[in-house]
Structures are given as C-alpha cells and as structure tokens.
Amino acid sequence: MYSIKCDDNKVMPRERLMRLGAESLSNQELLAILLRTGNKEKHVLELSSYLLSHLDSLADFKKMSLQELQHLAGIGKVKAIEIKAMIELVSRILATDKTLTDSVLTSVQVAEKIMAALGDKKQEHLVVLYLDNQNRIFEEKTIFIGTVRRSLAEPREILYYACKNMATSLIVIHNHPSGNIEPSSNDYCFTEKIKRSCEDLGIICLDHIIVSYKDYYSFREKSTLF
C-alpha cells in the first residue's frame, strides 16, 4: 500500500500545509492527507485525484454512503468512516459559523445559510427561524423530521414556540430531498394556513422557503401569497 510519504520528487501535502498553510493546498492534496495511504493500485495522491474526478462537486461527498465511498475509492470501512465523520464535522462547523444572529435582509441570505445544513438531508426537515422586533434571528428550531407532509398540515407546534419565545416574526423552511424545489399543492396550502394562523396571533410570517442542496424557492419572491 502506497503511503503519502513515498513520493520523493515533490514536497508532500503535509509539508506544504506546515510551510504554507492549509488554504494553499489543492482539493487533491487535502483529500490525500485525510486518506493518508493509497491502495494496492494507486499512490495516495493518485487515489485522491481519481476519487475527485468521479464527483461533480465536493458536495457529492455528503451524499455518498459509506458503501459508495468504499467502492469508489477502494478503501476500507474504517477509512471511509473517518472521511464521513470529517465531512459531517466540517458541515457542523459551517453551520455554526453561519449562525443566524444578524438581521435578516433577504430570502436569499436565509436560503444560503440553511442550504448548507439541510440541502443534503435524505429526509425532509421542517425548520423555523424565530425573529425579534429588529429582524434578528434568536432561535432556529427543527419542528419535524421525516414526512413533512404530515408536519405541514399542522402549524400548532410552530406557533407554540413563537408564542413561548415572544417572537415578532418567523420564517419557515423545509427541504426537498429530491432536489426539485418547485412547491407542491400541499406546500401552497400549508403556506396559506401558517400565514393566516400567524396573522391571527399578531405574528408576521416573513417567508416560506424550500431548499435543495443547490437551489431554493421563496414564496415571498415567487408567489402571490406574500
């Protein structure tokens, strides 16, 4: 098995990282550091290059199962688990780094922040952002995971947290795992229902946003409901 240390003709990724910083490394080199060793056929840099060449984008890593990663990269289960764990950790770091504490200005700002967290989920998630009277998000609450159709029919829990936290307004977001962001008839019905229910309680429903891993649909921007 080829190690990351075996190439004497160039400065290897670890040494480049120590000398120049992680930001100076290519995707191939960063992945090689995570892989550490190659397989029987390929040096670790060749293996990382091969793996990247079979992906449309780095985001595809999040969508791959352990079995798919093992098969494509020709690596063992332990190494595949380590890579998946690192990918999840990076995802959580990004989500933390993009904590929604600033004032909300546009739907696209919200969508870009939430897409990183929800875009690759295999199940549908319904998330609500609760805002104060200065349009600052003070809480992000996952209301439901699983069959969003069932959740979309019942806004009671959404409004419970709004009243409990004395929210002035809220934004509803859910993902479409299929990647198709076009709203269904059920999405339209739910949006009308939650908007009416919010108005009855003096709470403003600012938007209902549907996200995928690369795009979003804003009812405020594209529908006549707002």
UniProtKB/Swiss-Prot annotation:
Pfam families referenced in this protein's UniProt entry, alphabetically: RadC (PF04002), UPF0758_N (PF20582)
Originating species: Streptococcus pyogenes serotype M3 (strain ATCC BAA-595 / MGAS315)
Keywords: Hydrolase, Metal-binding, Metalloprotease, Protease, Zinc
Superkingdom as given in the UniProt entry: Bacteria
Protein's name according to its UniProt entry: UPF0758 protein SpyM3_0777
Similarity comment: Belongs to the UPF0758 family.
Residue window of motif JAMM motif: 174-187
A GO molecular function held by the record: metal ion binding
Binding-site positions, Zn(2+): 174, 176, 187
Residues of the MPN domain: 103-225
A biological process from GO: proteolysis
